[in-house]
């Protein structure tokens, strides 16, 4: 869609590194996940284990235990994607109603403070506000996600960090830690 519609959202398909970065238990957990993926029929081209030396070719970490890598991941700049998708669907005649608080919804109908909208398809893209909608509240799982981004980093710094091919990364701990190199050379 982004290619067909010409949406500039900094799309980069560099894969993702799930890193065992701090504890040997992380390595055991990731290797167990890899066995589960193999049991599902996903092969070496889909997910592969990287020993510390191989991981260091992609991301330089202090004393890692290894990583699980999949090429099937891309990063984007989400605000640019949303603006591009909005332009695309509006050009098709779709009307977007922003700042419209949803009071209730059911299949085919959304009721807002300003009125009701009927549609064949309803996408409840409400993120953290799902609890206020009875049909969704019971399915909500609260997740906190924080993001910090550096200023654009010089090439010398990136040579020390890695991530030359646009890979995203994550650490295999209970507290979700993840990041990427942005198109304008920030570490986010």
Show where each model-derived region lies.
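Helical element adjacent to the flavin cofactor pocket in flavoenzyme catalytic cores
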Residues: 28, 34-40, 62-121
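Flexible hinge/switch segments at interdomain interfaces of large molecular machines
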Residues: 10, 54-62
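General beta-strand structural signal in soluble alpha/beta enzymes
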Residues: 47-51, 96-98, 111-112, 124, ...
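Generic secondary-structure signature for well-ordered alpha-helical cores
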Residues: 3-7, 39-43, 60, 90-95, ...
């Amino acid at each position: 869609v982004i290619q067909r519609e010409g949406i500039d959202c900094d799309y980069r398909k560099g894969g993702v590194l799930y890193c065992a970065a701090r504890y040997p238990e992380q390595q055991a957990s990731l290797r167990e996940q890899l066995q589960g993926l193999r049991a599902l029929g996903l092969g070496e081209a889909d997910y592969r284990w990287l020993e510390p030396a191989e991981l260091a070719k992609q991301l330089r970490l202090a004393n890692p235990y290894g990583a699980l890598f999949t090429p099937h991941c891309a990063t984007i700049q989400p605000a640019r994607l949303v603006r591009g998708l909005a332009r695309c669907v509006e050009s098709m005649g779709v009307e977007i109603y922003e700042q419209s608080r949803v009071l209730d919804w059911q299949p085919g109908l959304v009721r807002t403070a300003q009125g009701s909208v009927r549609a064949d398809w309803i996408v409840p893209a409400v993120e953290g506000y799902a609890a206020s909608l009875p049909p969704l509240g019971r399915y909500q799982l609260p997740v906190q996600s924080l993001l910090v981004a550096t200023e654009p980093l010089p090439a010398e710094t990136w040579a020390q960090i890695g991530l030359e091919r646009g890979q995203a990364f994550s650490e295999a701990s209970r507290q979700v830690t993840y990041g990427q190199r942005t198109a304008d050379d920030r570490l986010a």
